[in-house]
Each structure stands twice: as C-alpha cells, then as structure tokens.
Curated annotation (Swiss-Prot):
Its EC number is 6.1.1.4. ATP binds at K632. The gene is leuS. The keyword Cytoplasm applies. A motif ('KMSKS' region) lies at residues 629-633. InterPro entries: aa-tRNA-synth_I_CS, aa-tRNA-synth_Ia, Leu-tRNA-ligase, Leu_tRNA-synth_edit, M/V/L/I-tRNA-synth_anticd-bd, Methionyl/Leucyl_tRNA_Synth, Rossmann-like_a/b/a_fold, tRNAsynth_Ia_anticodon-bd. One of its GO terms (molecular function) is aminoacyl-tRNA deacylase activity. Belongs to the class-I aminoacyl-tRNA synthetase family. Keywords: Aminoacyl-tRNA synthetase, ATP-binding, Cytoplasm, Ligase, Nucleotide-binding, Protein biosynthesis. GO terms for cellular component: cytosol. Its main location: cytoplasm. This is Leucine--tRNA ligase.
Amino acid sequence: MHEQYQPREIEAAAQSIWDAQKSFEVREQPGKDTFYCLSMFPYPSGKLHMGHVRNYTIGDVIARYQRMQGRNVLQPMGWDAFGMPAENAAMKNRVAPAKWTYENIAYMKSQLKSLGLGIDWSREVTTCKPDYYRWEQWLFTRLFEKGVIYRKNGTVNWDPVDQTVLANEQVIDGRGWRSGALVEKREIPMYYFRITAYAEELLQSLDSLPGWPEQVKTMQRNWIGKSYGADIVFDYDQASVGEAGQLRVYSTRPDTLMGATYVAVAAEHPLAQRAAANDPALAAFIAECKAGSVAEADMATMEKKGLATGQFVVHPLTGDRLPVFVANYVLWGYGEGAVMAVPAHDERDFEFANKYGLPIRQVYAAEGRDFSASEWQAWYADKEGLTTVDSGKYDGKSFTEAFDAIVADLEATGHGARKTQFRLRDWGISRQRYWGCPIPIIHCEACGDVPVPEEQLPVVLPEDVVPDGTGSPLAKMPEFYECACPKCGKPAKRETDTMDTFVESSWYYARYASPQYAGGMVDPQAADHWLPVDQYIGGIEHAILHLLYARFFHKLMRDEGLLSSDEPFENLLTQGMVVAETYYRTLENGGKDWFNPADVEVERDARAKVIGARLKSDGLPVEIGGTEKMSKSKNNGVDPQAMIDAYGADTCRLFMMFAAPPELSLEWSDAGVEGASRFLRRVWRLAHAHVGAGLPGTLDKARLSDAQKEIRRAIHLAIRQASQDVGQHHKFNTAIAQVMTLMNVLEKAPAADEQDRALLQEGLETVALLLAPITPHICHALWEALGKDGLIIDAAWPTVDETALVQDTLTLVVQVNGKLRGEIQVPAAASREEIEAAARANENVLRFTEGLAIRKVIVVPGKLVNIVAN
C-alpha cells in the first residue's frame, strides 16, 4: 500500500479490474432479487456538465448499495441522440449531425467511465441508430392501423424565410430566431398520438405510485386536468348570423350561465371567418390573432384583446341575445374553440368586459360582502359559501344545486349535457426536421396514407446530410422520398417529417432489458424480468412531458402484449440543480459580461458569504450576481473533467453526495471539494499506518474493555445510521457525516495491543464498506490492503451487531433548576431511586443545592436528571 493517496493510479487500477472481469454486466438470474436502477440518459451535447455528474453519481450510489444487498442490479446507459442541437451545430460547423453526434458520444462515454460508474455498457442504446428506431417505426405502424395514431391539420409556427416550422421557444418576439422573419401561423397535416384515450388511466394510476414525489404527481394531475362541467349549446341568432346553426361551448361553471353576457370565439372559428368576409378591420384582427403564440402558457400573461363580430347567439335559458366576439385568448385547438363569458365570476372575462364596456351581471352573492363591477375580488370566483341571486327560478341555490338544476333544464331542451373533460391534448409528433426518426408512412394518391410494411422497416435516415436551415432536407431528396406504394405498386411519396424526439425517450428504459433482441421492440420475457424500473433518477424539469409520455408508452406496449406491468417507474427521485456563484461587469450597451468563478478572487465575511470580488487578470472589481444554476449563459460552470483530473473521481463523488441531500440544490464550493479530498487522505493515512504494522488476528468480543466497547459501539452506530440513511431515505449526506464521526473515533483509538488493532481493523473495514457505493475506487484499494478476499463490489453491506449497541453504563447529565451542573455514570439497569441518589451525591450538584430545599427530582430515563430547588 503506497504511503500517499494517489487517486489517478488507484482509480485506473480499480476500473481496469472491473472492465476485465465484466463486473457490471448482468444476465437474468431467475430466483434472485432484481434491482433496476436508471438515471435519465443524456443528450450527447459534447461534454458532461455537473448536473450529469450529480445525476449519475446518485444513481450509481443507489445501484452499488443494492448490489451489496445481494440483488442482481441492472444499471444501463445510452444516448438520447436525435434533436435540434445537432442540426444547429451542423449548420454552424458545416458537418453532418451524425458525425457530430457520434464524436460527442465517444468523448462523453470516456468521461462517464472515468467517474467509475457501475454501468452495464453491453446494453448501451443510441436512439439515432436504425437498430433502435426501427422498433419505434414498427410500433407507429401498429398504432396507426389501430387508430391510436391519426393524421389531422395542426397549427404551427412557420418561418417564411427559412421555410421551416419553429418550436415555440424558437420564436422570439414574434420573429424566427435565425432569420429574424415575422413568424406566421400555418395549418399543416401532422400525426398525433391519441394520448387522450388513456387520460383517465394516466390519472388514476398515479395513485399506484407511492414512490413518486407528491409534487410530480400533482403536476401531472394538473396537466391531465380532469374537470367536471357541461357542454352548453347557444342557437345562432339568424337575423345577425344570416343562417341557422348552433354554437357549442364547454364550461366547468354551468351554474353561472345566468350571468353570461357575451361569448368569445377563436380566430379560426367559422363564425369569425364568416363575419370577417365583409369586415376588413375584423379580418386584420383575425390575422393578428393567428400570428400570435399557440402556447397555452403565453395565453395567461398576454394582453386580452377582442373585436365584436356583429353577430349574436341566443341564451338557452333566458332567450337574451348575447354578442359574439373574436378574442385572442380563445384557442381553436381546445374544445370547441369558443367560450361563454361570465364577467362577474371569472377574472379574465371581468377584465375583458371592463375593457370593452360589456355588461357584468352578478349571479352569486356572499353574506356581508359587497360586489363591485369596477374592482375584481377573489371571492367572486368561489364555489363554496355563496348563494345564487338575480337568477330567476334558480335563486337561493348553492353551487351544486344551481349546477344540477341548470344542467337538467339544458338537457331537457337539448341545449346541453353533463360532461367530464380533460385538459390534456393529443400529442402531435410530426417535426419538419431532418435529425429525427423518419415517420414510416407512404402517401399514395390512390390508397391514401399507407404504413410501411414490417419487412421494409427500418426507414433509414440518410446520415451524410448537412442541413442549411432552410426547409426540410429530406423533402429535397428524391432518392429518399420517391418509392412505390406497398398496396398498389404505383409511384408514391414517402413522408419527410420526422418524429418528436420525446418518442425515443419514451421507451428506451424498456429496450435496455433486451437491447440486442432482433425479434421485436422488447423481449417480453426480459421486460417482465426487469420491469418496472425500481429507481428512476432525473431532474424535476421532466416532471410532465417526458414522464407522462413514458407512462403513456408503457401502457401502449402493455396493450401490444410486449410487457405486463402498468407503470414504467416504481420509484422516482428528482435531484436538485447544481448552482454556483455568478460574477459580471455591466457593458456600455447595458448587457452583462459574465466571468467564470475560477477567474475571480473573492473576499468573504466571517460566515463565508462573498462580500467582494475582483477579476484576477486586472485586479479590478466585478459585480456579484448571486448563486444561479450552472450554465453557459452565466459562465458559472465548472468542468467535471478538470475536477476529476485534479482530485480524482472519488473526491468529486464524495463532494456531490455530501454537499446536499439529493432532492435539494447543490451549491458548488471549491472549499467543499478540497475538504472531501482531505477526508479521503485521512482515511488512507489511517489505513496505511494500520496495514504497515501488520494485519491483526480475530477480535475477541468476549473480553473487550469498557473503552473498546465504546469504540465498537461507534462502529455499529455508524452501520445502523448509514443503513437507514442510504437504504431507506437516500440521505447520503448524513450517512457520510456518520462515517466522518466514526473516523474521528478511530483516529483517536489506541493501537497498543492485538485487541486494539483487531478493533481498528473492524472499524476500517466498516468505513470501506459504508463508503464503497460513494467512493468505490479508494474502497476497492482499502479492501485489498486490509487483506480481504474478493472485490469489495461483491462484498455484502455490513450488518449491525445489536449486542455492540448495548451499554453497561449510561452517562446522564444533571441539571439544577434547568441549568447543567454535572454528569453521572450509572449502570444501564439502575432504578429511578439509584439514579436520583447518584445525582444528589454529585460533588458539583451539592455545591449548587447547598442551603436550598429540594422540591422535586425529575428523571428522564437514559437522558437527564433535573433537580428543582429553592
């Protein structure tokens, strides 16, 4: 054992043994407990960032701990390799996205290996490879034939200069992010997954996931958005509309129908189009609405605008004529593209009515509260504690009573019906992009949309294309799209859209169970052996889309007979962000020039808070921007590779696990990394001194001195605490703190005789075992140096010896009138009377009770004695 701790050599040696022995490659072992631990796979952006390191270290610690519990552990890794960044990099560097992607994968894989992750690399999947996406295409064709996937027109952001569709985040202030052109709204045919058919099951089965954070389940419930309400039908006012017809709206508040004073429709609604034909101002407003955002999030914050159409509809209960407005906050793709407006009891309608001078009719009142039509108050929208007013025959009713009575009357006249609705919309997966999975459909003039037959799959994406940012490259490649119709044999055209990259990440976890399986999407036997995933780890930012789509895909695969479980992920851990200090100078144009923390010298106060900072290069001050998520834009990232090169992977892993509980943000600290490195050097020093003196014989537990019993008790307290913290609560930081406490005890422990040294041996073995999941390389070396057989990765997690925790004597504190005045040693089995007598006889206690009358003595068993005297 080398005298100095040398992480580079130690880590290389451990990793080469794991590689040679294929230590982390797993096979199905029927009868052996399985544990499938999965961290969300990365996008191969070029290099790992600290968020990746944290995510994969957490996963690895859990996987290694479960292996020590005797389970057959699967921890795979792969690459979410399709997507826009590859196209952008390709345009910038004039290189094919495939080449850029594969080079990034090679580098990032070497980085992951240097972290010492216990990954089964034989199961690696890369989503841009045809042997992966062919099964996605196969499922697409099956679902298309069943009607679970369908084609319809969808509204997209169209860049007229680049001739391409933009994602919402690529539209900046109404203009294309690359071309700067004014973006248009366009209707184009797109493919959709009918996820709404699974809405009820996706909602209900959240209740079968106790191992998921409540916050994530709430976010999904809200996204699915089940609501109870009614469809309400307003007849057209024929005189103003010019024809007979009906306007349908869905409302969760039919109880407020008596307060409806207008209706609003989307720009694309037939009533809007009809009115605009003879009204240039309205036509211009409709064009403006169509150019606006289609994102629901933007709807909430943007200014609400509307224009009267001059048309009216008839109130189904009162017969009143209600004006029809076109409004920019009504989305055509949602419900019927129309809403009824009750300004008195809906804040958005209230603002709109006040802006355009529309009537506000109060139909609910609260006792002791005044209603004002000029100022919104939160209680106007309440359901509880209010009573209907000014509602004719519906007066004096509660929410439920009014709801039931009004819906019953609507149903009786054919003007409405109860309805349960979901906020969730079908998932549009068509992307007018190149670097994605080709959609396996052939368009034939005679036969329509024809799925590519199974024997012709995969539809391979050509990999030698360099996109230029204009239009779809595939649509310019006759060699790709020209084909024969599989049904009639006539010339036909292949679909040139590719799939949303969320599709690949919706089923990768299942492919890991049988990545080389050529007989189907997954091998059902292997899928049922490993799935569901026991522990999934990833960022909270994926709470809705990725996790919802993966749950949806799991149910699709189940219904195809590919697997039998209902949910993909049994337990979910959402790790917090990695944050760091930010520093900047304000530029003349008002912008900010950000400096990396490594280039800044800081001054701290007594509590280590940064109070001043200057740039190392010029010695001049910089502004302190506070702690923010590590990012390129704020230039506050720390390169994991530089840290691994400087300190070793174990130090980085230890710091990551010690600095914060996994679900909270972790603040980067150079001092913290230095501290982690110091601690590992201490462990190494103690082990080196111990091993250098020769390995001891077996500990004789029957003849331990009291001092030795205390040391052994500290060892087994550490085992008990760490087992709870790591195994039950994922509180790795407190488990490490417990090992540090044990190290303090072991460093002070005597090594005078064979018993002392045998006890130190047990202590060091325990430190190695408890740290093995967190710092696997140094523990690999320690285990060998301590003379243990086999590898520590194959050792069992230590068990608590309950007899070691039993204390013969207890130390109790003694208080006089609540103030600490002494300590006493008493036998563990001492009676209350014996404890009281020992406390009264304590020399210091006698001094503080002299001349006082003792009124009572309170004994808290195992803790303290309090003497009350005056």
